[in-house]
């Protein structure tokens, strides 16, 4: 298994809080999943897999496990069928909302010249 997807404690790069946060959230998909939960509240595995960014099922499963292991998301009424499991943000996951909002504003301001089709901030 790819070390990045391992749910064991990360290899902390340094004592810097930004680097430590990125050790947990700095992959390509984690903040996209958090974004979806902020926008929609609760999401099922199937709903995540239908995201326009096109996350593969093996990466999705690993990311959900990773974010759950660090207490950022939690299962809601899990059942035997993994595709029907629903997830929601915990208080520590919800605390990322202003971070994502600011990242969205920054992207809209500074990346629009490079990516003219970038969506307006909602």
For the regions a language model picked out, list residue spans one by one.
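Residue-level recognition of specific faces of alpha-helices
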Residues: 21, 36, 47, 63, ...
């Amino acid at each position: 298994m790819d070390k990045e997807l391992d749910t064991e404690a990360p290899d902390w790069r340094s004592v810097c809080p930004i680097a430590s946060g990125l050790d947990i959230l700095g992959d390509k998909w984690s903040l996209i999943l958090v974004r979806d939960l902020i926008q929609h509240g609760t999401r099922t595995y199937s709903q995540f897999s239908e995201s326009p960014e096109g996350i593969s099922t093996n990466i999705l499963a690993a990311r959900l496990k990773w974010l759950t292991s660090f207490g950022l998301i939690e299962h809601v009424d899990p059942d035997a069928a993994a595709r029907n499991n629903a997830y929601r943000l915990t208080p520590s996951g919800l605390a990322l909302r202003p971070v994502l909002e600011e990242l969205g504003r920054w992207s809209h301001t500074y990346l629009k010249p490079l990516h003219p089709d970038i969506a307006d901030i909602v």
